[in-house]
Amino acid sequence: MPQLNPEPWLTTFLIVWISLIVILQPKIASLMLTSSPTPYKAMTIKTWPWPWT
């Protein structure tokens, strides 16, 4: 099998990575936007009892 590309895994990885970014970017952005307030709420809830404990 003649190896046309010296690193075929790299190009494959890049193609898969770019396609994943393009496909998942809206989902990731919406997930980050929807789930970003909840960790802050959890953090504030967790950090509130600290002075009393």
From Swiss-Prot:
Component of the ATP synthase complex composed at least of ATP5F1A/subunit alpha, ATP5F1B/subunit beta, ATP5MC1/subunit c (homooctomer), MT-ATP6/subunit a, MT-ATP8/subunit 8, ATP5ME/subunit e, ATP5MF/subunit f, ATP5MG/subunit g, ATP5MK/subunit k, ATP5MJ/subunit j, ATP5F1C/subunit gamma, ATP5F1D/subunit delta, ATP5F1E/subunit epsilon, ATP5PF/subunit F6, ATP5PB/subunit b, ATP5PD/subunit d, ATP5PO/subunit OSCP. It is found in: Mitochondrion membrane. The lineage of its organism: Eukaryota, Metazoa, Chordata, Craniata, Vertebrata. Subunit 8, of the mitochondrial membrane ATP synthase complex (F(1)F(0) ATP synthase or Complex V) that produces ATP from ADP in the presence of a proton gradient across the membrane which is generated by electron transport complexes of the respiratory chain. ATP synthase complex consist of a soluble F(1) head domain - the catalytic core - and a membrane F(1) domain - the membrane proton channel. These two domains are linked by a central stalk rotating inside the F(1) region and a stationary peripheral stalk. Belongs to the ATPase protein 8 family. Its main location: mitochondrion. Keywords: ATP synthesis, CF(0), Hydrogen ion transport, Ion transport, Membrane, Mitochondrion, Transmembrane, Transmembrane helix, Transport. One of its GO terms (biological process) is proton motive force-driven ATP synthesis. It comes from Alligator mississippiensis (American alligator). GO terms for cellular component: mitochondrial membrane; proton-transporting ATP synthase complex. This is ATP synthase F(0) complex subunit 8. Pfam families: ATP-synt_8. The chain crosses the membrane at residues 8-24.
